[in-house]
Swiss-Prot record:
EC number annotated for this UniProt entry: 3.1.-.-
Cofactors, names only: Zn(2+)
Phylogenetic lineage: Bacteria, Pseudomonadati, Thermodesulfobacteriota, Desulfuromonadia, Geobacterales
GO cellular component term of the entry, any: cytoplasm
Source superkingdom: Bacteria
Name listed for the protein in its UniProt record: Endoribonuclease YbeY
Gene (name only): ybeY
Ligand binding (Zn(2+)): H112, H116, H122
C-alpha cells in the first residue's frame, strides 16, 4: 500500500505520518490493501483553484476527489485509486462549527474523499446511495476511533 501525502499549507499543523496511517487503515477497511493513493492538504486558495479548473465552481470546498478508475485510461493501473485534496482551512472552520477537533474533521474528510474514489456517492446517485455512503462513513470512522487513530 502506498499513500503519498503532500502538505501544501502551513497554517494548520498536520502530522503526515499519522495521517498516512489513517489513510492506510481506511483503505484496509474498504478492502484495498494493495492500492495507491495521493493526498494533498492545501488551503482555501488552493482548493478553490482546483474546484474552479476541474469542477467549474469558483469557491473553496472541504474535499475534492479524483478517481483514477474514471476516464479513458482508468483500467491501466487499477491499484492506483486516485487523489484526495482537502482544504485545511475549511476543515478547521467546520471543526469549530461542529464542536470537534481539527484532527477529527480532517480524518473524516479524508475518509469521505476515499469513499468517493472507491465508488461511493451522495450527490448524483440518489437517497439510497447517500444513506449507504453515510453508513459506511459511520462504520469506518468508528473503527478509526476504536483504534485511537482519531
Amino acid at each position: 500500500m502506498k499513500v503519498a501525502i503532500a502538505n501544501r499549507q502551513r497554517r494548520h499543523p498536520i502530522g503526515t505520518p499519522r495521517l498516512r496511517k489513517v489513510a492506510e487503515r481506511i483503505l484496509s477497511a474498504l478492502g484495498y490493501p494493495d492500492s495507491e493513493l495521493s493526498v494533498v492538504i492545501t488551503g482555501d486558495l488552493g482548493i478553490r483553484r482546483v474546484n474552479r479548473e476541474y469542477l467549474h465552481k469558483d469557491r473553496p470546498t472541504n474535499v475534492i476527489s479524483f478517481a483514477m478508475a474514471e476516464g479513458e485510461f482508468g483500467a491501466l493501473n487499477p491499484a492506483m485509486l486516485g487523489d484526495v485534496i482537502i482544504s485545511a482551512d475549511t476543515a478547521a472552520r467546520e471543526a469549530e462549527e461542529g464542536g470537534v477537533s481539527f484532527w477529527s474533521r480532517l480524518c473524516f474528510l479524508l475518509l469521505h474523499g476515499i469513499l468517493h474514489i472507491t465508488g461511493y456517492d451522495h450527490e448524483r446517485s440518489g437517497e439510497a446511495e447517500a444513506r449507504r455512503m453515510e453508513a459506511k462513513e459511520r462504520e469506518i470512522f468508528a473503527i478509526l476511533e476504536r483504534e485511537g487513530l482519531v
